[in-house]
Amino acid sequence: MKIKTKQITVTAIMLAICLVSQFFKNLSVYITGPIINAALILTVLYAGMACGIILSIITPVTSFFITGSPVMAAIPAMFPCIMIGNIILVVCVELLRKKCGKAAGFPVSIAIGAVLKAVFMGIAIALIILPTFLPAPMHKMLQVLQLQFSVTQLITAVIGGVYAVIIAAVLKKTSLAQAD
């Protein structure tokens, strides 16, 4: 696979947006989450699935380094699950947006991807990893963390998808949206 300059540029810009948004994660996951999900979706749309997958893998790591989550530090097994959740969203958008028809395909693929991402993370993280590996001093946070890694993931992915649909509509007439 040959990566083109446009793909590198789009991916770099989306990564920069993700990095800046991650500084606000301690304010609210409802600020950072939708921005990162929108960036993942837009990366797929304008740079391709491979670049979206790369960003899906990088963003959980950069988030940890920027915000330093004690839960992530205590349970490193969550990293691959978050990465896989992001990849599920990216792959759904890429594979389903064309299959569901030109007009409805993009939003439908986002909705399906958001649900599948939340279901995967809800099962893998909220129901398996957290109850099994959460250190005893953190057990009082279990219900909040389970909510954060299931329902909150659905909400932030859907909001990010709405942002992506709006941004893509605005960018539709630009050279960025034109096929190479």
Feature-to-residue mapping (PLM):
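Loop-helix junctions at membrane interfaces
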Residues: M1-D180
